[in-house]
Amino acid sequence: PLFVALGKDIRGVVVSQVVPSPRSAATPIVREYLAAIDNSDQSPSYESLEGFIAAKALGEAVRRNGAGLNRASMQKALAGLGDLDVGGFRLHLRAGVRDSTWAIDLVTVTADGRVLR
């Protein structure tokens, strides 16, 4: 990770995040995520929250696809999700579009690796 590579020199680095803070239960998706990792060895992180959100979208595409799942039908199902609300976090999934979210949060990293919003 960037923190390991830079050590204390990371102080003041600004990083863009494309998901909500994994430590703020202000949105339903973060509350669901925190409940899912509760009582596990998983610590809340931006990376695992992003994976959780992606898994929710993938699950919805599988549900909508129905029987006969294959690569082509899955691509079509994902592209067909359109504007998808995943627990208060909006995704915009369309054919040929690879940037599925317009949410960007800028955070600053402290010398000890904490993230400040």
Model-identified regions with their sequence ranges:
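Extracytosolic ligand-binding ectodomains
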Residues: P1-R117
